[in-house]
Amino acid sequence: MINTIKQDAKNRMEKTLSVYLSDVDGIRTGRARASVLDGIVVETYGGRVKLNTISSISVSDNKTLLVKVWDINNVGAIKTAIINSNLGFGFSCEGAVIRLTVPDMTQDMRKNLVKLLGKISEDCRISIRNIRRDIMDKLKIMQDNKDISEDDLRIAGVEIQKITDEIIKKINDTFLAKEKELLHV
């Protein structure tokens, strides 16, 4: 029973970490990364589809992304989706190839992104601690109901704290790496 609760805690914390990592990956750094376009949805074929399902996206150089559209009829819809995404890319079209240019970032933009990164990181750490607290509350209720002993509660608490520390370390490491990437000109 305790192992199930510990596994639940670990799963919930890892899901939170996964969401955090995808949020951090979406923060633009001034360098071309194909993953920046992952969230773009295109209105085509009578519905909404992700950009990467109707084209291939590659990095040409540090400042340029190439979007090779598989069906030339979708170029207009893709251009509209990119403009509506407000990512600030400059672009040019050459047939079925859309060339996206990543604009240079000012120092103020970089500092604001670091602040945003710090807020996202702190929110994630708070979520992780809340998960830990919820799990510990469940364990205390179980101990009050005499389902587990006080020793089991203490041991489980130490193990859950260890999991919490590991996840928070990953958050801190990711924050520091992304901060360095953002501030590097």
UniProtKB/Swiss-Prot annotation:
Q: Which InterPro entries match?
A: Ribosome_recyc_fac, Ribosome_recyc_fac_dom, RRF_sf
Entry GO CC: cytoplasm
Q: Which domain of life is it from?
A: Bacteria
Supply the SUPFAM superfamilies for this chain: Ribosome recycling factor, RRF
The record's Gene Ontology biological-process terms are: translational termination
Q: Which UniProt keywords apply?
A: Cytoplasm, Protein biosynthesis
Q: Name one Pfam family in it.
A: RRF
S-S bonds? none
What are this entry's molecular-function GO terms? ribosomal large subunit binding
Compartments in which it is found: Cytoplasm
Recorded hits in PANTHER family, A to Z, give: MITOCHONDRIAL RIBOSOME RECYCLING FACTOR PSEUDO 1, RIBOSOME RECYCLING FACTOR
The protein's role, per its UniProt record? Responsible for the release of ribosomes from messenger RNA at the termination of protein biosynthesis. May increase the efficiency of translation by recycling ribosomes from one round of translation to another.
Q: Which family does it belong to?
A: Belongs to the RRF family.
- What is the name of this protein? Ribosome-recycling factor
User: What organism is the protein native to?
Assistant: Ehrlichia ruminantium (strain Gardel)
Gene symbol here is frr
